[in-house]
Amino acid sequence: MERTPDGRRLLVSRQIDAPPELVWDLFVDTRQWPRWGPSITAVECSERRIREGTTGRVRTVGGLRVSFVVTACEDCRWTWRVAGIPATGHRVETTEGGCRAVFEIPLLAAPYAAVCERALRSLDALAMERSRGD
């Protein structure tokens, strides 16, 4: 648990042996979200790479479409509101030999940690694939 700019959050993280810029690009590129996000099957967005103010809709595994707005996107950290509710934050921290990808989960959404762990495994695999040039 950690205090973030958005309040106390549960952190789920993973060390990834890839350049932080590459992992950050996977986080902000909406075309990649369905590849690493297990709860997202499609994204409709005002732009490919998010920034503060970006809006769109994600389609979930159950087919539900929910709107989102990116509330902050700077210094390798972005946050959003999904269906008007503050949702998981995303950040990348530089480490020796790579980076650490982190999800900041609102305390009321603690069960979502399992989904975030799965997302981090997928993100790691995708980053490794990109690093090798596959």
Give short role names for the model-derived ranges.
Residues R14-A18, T60, I105-L107:
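Short beta-strand-to-loop capping motifs
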